[in-house]
């Protein structure tokens, strides 16, 4: 028969003490109570011990104060008198105890009450109730008291000094089988809680008991260090675009209005250029522009928008408001030879908008811009590319609707369908207007689209407040 | 993006058919008009539309209904607006600050509550979209029966005339209006040199003082039947187009008739409005090439007519007639978009183009991603802060004095006005935000910083940096040195170290990283004053390194 080490320990107590039975409380000096109960349950299952439960009525002490009548006697003794008027008891006892005292004095006959006075013959009277309280302190089991004593205990209960309760007395006894078992020696191995090098190389583990664990007990969670969730989205998008044959490009964060707006055919008096939307720089505030390109752009603006173009506006420095500036800079940098080839490029970077900060808006956020330039690309191809891109991002249902951007025509916005949310706008796109491409000498069509990452991040991570992305709460960064 | 609220009942009246909410939500986006919502107000159903800024002709219920009747095919082609002659004249003097004015009449309009509301809203929206908040274009709409032609447009001085402005019962001079009237206060910046444009009638009564305010005399009410429209501005084209948008919208109303006004300046006469359509030429080959479609000329023409244009097929070319209220059609590409809209964006099959190009990552970005892997391997969490910060965090709390940074003119908030040139301070701020979280905390950030560079075309330069910090019960120089050297080793950078006196660090426990004699970074134990400035209570070590 295989026994747990604690089972052996418990049986050894019976063996060493040469006894067949113990009360539970007697065993508690050898082993914690909870362990005794658990182990004896195991041994009971193996028919080596049996347990016997007896419910015993016990007397519980509730109040350990002097009786109020004794307080009166002590008061009189201190003052070397033997009587007191009832009306003066309020100086000795609280109001609620006075009646109790008077009742007790009459019942016990320890003093005479005559003409409004209490007269003690003997201030050192013997009190049966007091004696019984003392006895209860030594033995709380109700059955050990005589019938006469039980009556007095009832009085004590009424007076609020004691109460009745029940206590289970558990006795653990060896069965016949158990008695036979302990006739043989019981060997207890050493217990191991932590495997160490010494234990391993010495071979102690061969004779030792390695304590088992509860495999379901919760342990402290560990989180890997990780990149920011925004970085994970950026990586995912880059992977898709690389697979689609796109090359990554970069451009300045501080831009002139020339590259950010003028080159993109946005009129200089367009509302988007007002203070409300764009971060203008206090210092520095003016940049350099390629002069030959400037004159071409000016000519296009004045011809189409029919207004007076201001070159000083073009030189103003701002924080770029979109990544389209990257695309247009790239196209402008192409040599004549390079213009003959197809191009697919993308830029993922931060852009800035002067918007009040709230749960939906931040003054800066990540945007991705992509363009495709080739001889015969068209609007239908643009829709094809966007469907492919969005499908790869995990959006199955995609639809398109007309939109407006100053630098593209036709223009569209793409929406994706989300279960429980409906259709959600996700990106804007179009074909660069001829007026955008004319100054840089490009005659092929150029498809273009841009997507903001804030919305992607909110969808992907279930955020309801965009500010959470940059709050950098480490608990969130660990779990997300 | 401007929005307008339209009463559903008014829209149905103008379209001349009942409209289900679902139909509205489905069809208007197809023509490029977003339905922001449909809701009830005072027991009446309201539709909120978002209008693209290139379609000011959609800024009214009348214009929307006209477009909608076309897109769903119940009334297509160019809308013909008859212009009746009148003997009304406007004499224009030289008004330097707002030299252009156009004027017209629309008579017979039944101005019920819907129409009155629509007029007021259209005026307000056009002030922004066409008028750049009245600077470029300002509009006056008047009860024509309250004044007597001919009319005069001239300049007066600040106390050169008196009249009761709209929404007032007190006669004021122009200067007093700028000081006391709500609109005067708001638009005072548009008046220069005490010269006030003014429009008067033959009896010397004031119609309006552009671009500030109309006179109370000609206030439009539901009793008005004949409307006089004035448009003034700094841009002739914008002034004329704005007038066209307004008169054609009003002519959509029952019984509304446009009447011409003769505008005379320097003995030269111009008749307004000029609703002559523009003409453009394109080909079906061009349209199909742009769209990737295979449409016949006849089909293309039908689609254009749904967009309320007209077109003819002549000599293998498509001649397109564009209504005078459109401001968004410059060339062939715009015609292609009209065809695509009428065809239906979601009918395009979406053919993926087969174009042979090679995907490639930016080399510096690749390096940054490699660094991310190293730092995560070291057990650091990546954080991403905003680039816009403030001098308290970037300099003061770091015990740094620096005046050479890029600042925005009008920040979104006081905390976001300086473009960062260093990342380390933002990591200290991140530690502050997490000061009640479990230790140790190890965080890093890789990102762009911007420094001033007078030699660059944008007078600035982007510098890519990485910074990292550790806060722990016990941490010191040795720990951060091991991490920094581990990073430099993985990056195969040949470096030297030397003592560095950086005010944010403890003196004698800070080192600079030199490469080819140039400082590319630094690391060490953060100064306890900096630690307490960021409300922290444990030792902090950190580093910053330029990436190139």
UniProtKB/Swiss-Prot annotation, chain A:
It comes from the Archaea. One of its GO terms (molecular function) is ATP binding. GO terms for biological process: phenylalanyl-tRNA aminoacylation. It catalyses: tRNA(Phe) + L-phenylalanine + ATP = L-phenylalanyl-tRNA(Phe) + AMP + diphosphate + H(+). The keyword Magnesium applies. Binds 2 magnesium ions per tetramer. Its EC number is 6.1.1.20. Mg(2+) binds at residue 409. Keywords: Aminoacyl-tRNA synthetase, ATP-binding, Cytoplasm, Ligase, Magnesium, Metal-binding, Nucleotide-binding, Protein biosynthesis. L-phenylalanine binds at residues 324, 407, 432. Its main location: cytoplasm. It is an enzyme of class 6 (ligase). GO terms for cellular component: cytoplasm. PROSITE patterns: AA_TRNA_LIGASE_II. The keyword Magnesium applies. It is found in: Cytoplasm. Its cofactor is Mg(2+). Transmembrane segments: none annotated. Tetramer of two alpha and two beta subunits. Belongs to the class-II aminoacyl-tRNA synthetase family. Phe-tRNA synthetase alpha subunit type 2 subfamily. This is Phenylalanine--tRNA ligase alpha subunit. It comes from Methanocaldococcus jannaschii (strain ATCC 43067 / DSM 2661 / JAL-1 / JCM 10045 / NBRC 100440). The lineage of its organism: Archaea, Methanobacteriati, Methanobacteriota, Methanomada group, Methanococci.
UniProtKB/Swiss-Prot annotation, chain B:
GO terms for cellular component: phenylalanine-tRNA ligase complex. It comes from the Archaea. Its EC number is 6.1.1.20. Keywords: Aminoacyl-tRNA synthetase, ATP-binding, Cytoplasm, Ligase, Magnesium, Metal-binding, Nucleotide-binding, Protein biosynthesis. Mg(2+) binds at residues 328, 334, 337-338. One of its GO terms (biological process) is phenylalanyl-tRNA aminoacylation. It catalyses: tRNA(Phe) + L-phenylalanine + ATP = L-phenylalanyl-tRNA(Phe) + AMP + diphosphate + H(+). One of its GO terms (molecular function) is magnesium ion binding. PROSITE patterns: B5 (PS51483). InterPro entries: aa-tRNA-synth_II/BPL/LPL, B3/B4_tRNA-bd, DNA-bd_dom_put_sf, Phe-tRNA-ligase_IIc_bsu, Phe-tRNA-synth_IIc_bsu_arc_euk, Phe-tRNA_synthase-like_B3/B4, Phe_tRNA_ligase_beta2_arc, PheRS_beta_core. HAMAP family: Phe_tRNA_synth_beta2. This is Phenylalanine--tRNA ligase beta subunit. It comes from Methanocaldococcus jannaschii (strain ATCC 43067 / DSM 2661 / JAL-1 / JCM 10045 / NBRC 100440) (Methanococcus jannaschii). The gene is pheT.
């Amino acid at each position: 028969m295989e026994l747990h080490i604690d089972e052996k320990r418990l049986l050894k107590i019976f063996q060493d003490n040469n006894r067949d039975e113990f009360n539970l409380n007697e065993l508690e000096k050898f082993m914690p109570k909870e362990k005794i109960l658990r182990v004896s349950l195991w041994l009971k299952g193996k028919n080596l011990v049996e347990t016997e439960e007896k419910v015993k009525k016990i007397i519980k002490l509730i109040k350990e104060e002097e009786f109020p009548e004794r307080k009166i006697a002590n008061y009189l003794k201190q003052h070397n008198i033997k009587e007191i008027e009832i009306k003066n008891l309020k100086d000795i006892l609280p109001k609620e105890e006075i009646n109790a005292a008077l009742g007790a004095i009459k019942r016990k006959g320890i003093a005479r009450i005559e003409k409004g006075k209490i007269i003690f013959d003997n201030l050192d009277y013997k009190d049966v109730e007091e004696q019984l309280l003392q006895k209860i302190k030594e033995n709380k089991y109700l059955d050990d008291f005589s019938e006469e004593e039980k009556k007095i205990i009832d009085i004590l209960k009424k007076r609020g000094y004691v109460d009745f309760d029940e206590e289970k007395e558990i006795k653990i006894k060896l069965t016949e089988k158990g008695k036979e078992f302990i006739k043989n020696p019981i060997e207890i191995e050493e217990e191991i809680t932590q495997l160490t090098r010494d234990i391993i190389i010495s071979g102690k583990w061969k004779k030792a008991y390695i304590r088992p664990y509860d495999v379901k007990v919760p342990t402290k969670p560990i989180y890997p260090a990780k990149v920011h969730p925004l970085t994970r989205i950026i990586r995912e998008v880059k992977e898709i675009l690389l697979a689609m044959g796109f090359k990554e490009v970069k451009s300045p964060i501080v831009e002139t209005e020339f590259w950010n707006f003028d080159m993109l055919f946005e009129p200089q008096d367009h509302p988007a250029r007002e203070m409300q939307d764009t971060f203008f720089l206090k210092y520095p505030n003016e940049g350099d522009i390629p002069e030959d390109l400037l004159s071409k752009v000016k000519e296009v603006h004045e011809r189409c928008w029919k207004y007076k173009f201001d070159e000083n506006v073009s030189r103003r420095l701002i924080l770029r408001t979109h990544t389209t500036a990257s695309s247009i800079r790239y196209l402008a940098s192409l040599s004549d030879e390079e213009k003959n080839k197809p191009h697919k490029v993308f830029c993922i970077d931060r852009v800035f908008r002067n918007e009040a900060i709230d749960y939906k808006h931040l003054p800066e956020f990540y945007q991705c811009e992509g363009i495709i330039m080739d001889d015969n690309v068209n609007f239908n191809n643009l829709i094809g590319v966007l469907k492919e891109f969005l499908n790869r991002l995990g959006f199955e249902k995609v639809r398109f609707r007309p939109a407006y951007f100053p630098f593209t025509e036709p223009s569209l916005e793409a929406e994706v369908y989300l279960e429980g949310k409906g259709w959600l706008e996700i990106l804007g796109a179009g074909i660069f207007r001829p007026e955008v491409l004319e100054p840089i000498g490009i005659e092929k069509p150029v498809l273009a689209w841009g997507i903001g990452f804030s919305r992607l991040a909110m969808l992907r991570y279930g955020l309801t407040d965009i500010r959470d992305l940059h709050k950098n709460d480490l608990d969130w960064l660990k779990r997300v | 993006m401007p929005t307008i609220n339209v009463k559903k009942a008014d829209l149905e009246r103008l379209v001349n058919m009942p409209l289900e909410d679902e139909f509205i939500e489905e069809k208007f986006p197809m023509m490029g008009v977003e339905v922001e919502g449909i809701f009830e107000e005072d027991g009446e159903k309201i539709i909120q539309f978002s209008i693209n800024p290139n379609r000011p002709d959609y800024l009214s219920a009348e214009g929307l209904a006209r477009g909608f009747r076309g897109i769903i095919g119940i009334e297509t082609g160019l809308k013909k607006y008859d212009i009746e002659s009148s003997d009304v004249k406007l004499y224009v003097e030289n008004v330097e600050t707002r030299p252009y004015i156009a004027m017209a009449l629309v008579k017979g309009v039944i101005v019920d509550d819907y129409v009155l509301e629509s007029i007021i809203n259209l005026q307000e929206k056009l002030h922004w979209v066409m008028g750049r908040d009245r600077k470029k274009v300002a509009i006056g709409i008047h009860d024509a029966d309250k004044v007597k032609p001919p009319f005069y447009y001239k300049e007066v001085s600040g106390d050169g005339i008196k009249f009761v402005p709209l929404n007032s019962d007190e006669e004021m001079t122009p200067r007093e209006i700028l000081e006391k009237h709500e609109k005067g206060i708001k638009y005072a910046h548009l008046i220069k040199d005490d010269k006030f444009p003014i429009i008067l009638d033959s009896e010397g009564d004031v119609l309006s003082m552009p671009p500030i305010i109309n006179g109370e005399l000609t206030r439009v009410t539901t009793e008005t039947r004949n409307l006089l429209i004035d448009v003034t501005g700094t841009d002739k084209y914008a002034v004329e187009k704005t007038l066209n948008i307004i008169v054609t919208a009003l002519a959509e109303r029952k019984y509304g008739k446009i009447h011409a006004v003769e505008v005379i300046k320097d003995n030269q006469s111009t008749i307004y409005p000029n609703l002559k359509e523009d003409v453009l030429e394109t080909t079906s080959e061009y349209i199909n090439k742009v769209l990737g479609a295979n449409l016949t000329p006849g089909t293309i023409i039908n689609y254009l007519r749904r967009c309320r244009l007209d077109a003819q097929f002549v000599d293998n070319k498509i001649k397109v007639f564009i209504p005078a209220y459109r401001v968004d059609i410059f060339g062939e590409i715009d015609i292609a978009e009209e065809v695509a809209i009428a065809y239906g964006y979601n009918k395009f099959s979406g053919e993926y183009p087969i174009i042979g190009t090679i995907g490639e990552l930016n080399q510096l970005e690749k390096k940054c991603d490699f660094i991310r892997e190293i730092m995560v391997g070291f057990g650091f969490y990546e954080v991403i802060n905003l680039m816009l910060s403030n001098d308290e965090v970037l300099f003061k709390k770091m015990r740094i004095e620096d005046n050479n940074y890029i600042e925005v003119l009008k920040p979104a908030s006081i905390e976001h006005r300086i473009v960062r040139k260093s990342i380390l301070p933002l990591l200290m701020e991140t530690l502050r935000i997490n000061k009640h979280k479990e230790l140790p905390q190890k965080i890093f950030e890789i990102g762009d910083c911007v420094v001033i560079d007078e030699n660059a075309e944008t007078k600035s330069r982007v510098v890519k940096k990485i910074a990292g910090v550790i806060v722990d019960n016990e941490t010191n120089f040795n720990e951060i040195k091991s991490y920094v050297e581990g990073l430099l080793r993985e990056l195969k950078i040949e470096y030297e170290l030397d003592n560095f006196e950086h005010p944010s660090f403890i003196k004698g426990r800070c080192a600079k990283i030199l490469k080819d004699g140039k400082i590319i970074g630094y690391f060490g134990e953060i100064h306890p004053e900096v630690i307490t400035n960021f409300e922290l209570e444990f030792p902090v070590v950190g580093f910053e390194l330029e990436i190139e």
